[in-house]
């Protein structure tokens, strides 16, 4: 639980610093963007629970003032980080809140399918779960942005774990 609170404090500190550092209002927030990202499901086991991958976000299917609803999907792999490699697929709805012309907070709530492929075995181990990962998104240019935030996940059998997600985004 201490990792969750430290992540939330870092997110808020980054928000206050970046709001003043990027005050140009000429950038409009994209409705669609793709990202390259690294995420970890557990702060205590970053290498073992981490994955690098790509995501597609459609963050503005519906809009009410500064609130948007949308969806997203992501695919990541943990190949080369540990002996037993795995992959994960996340998909689900998201809520976005605009903080200004360059910043928004995105809150995806995703179903998670995690598959591992043990070395030397033909068996595949699959688990389903749920992830919630609020991210602060900052757009440097109209087509390029960065994001980071905490990530909470559970596979419905064990306690929830807390990790992080970070990456770069490209609007299209």
Where is each model-derived feature located?
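Cleavable N-terminal export/targeting peptides
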Residues: 1-30
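Extracytoplasmic loops and strand-loop junctions of Gram-negative outer membrane beta-barrel proteins
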Residues: 37-41, 117-119, 149-151
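Gram-negative (and chloroplast) outer-membrane scaffold detector with strong preference
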Residues: 54-146, 170-172
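Short, exposed beta-strand-loop hairpins at the edges of beta-sheets
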Residues: 144, 151-158
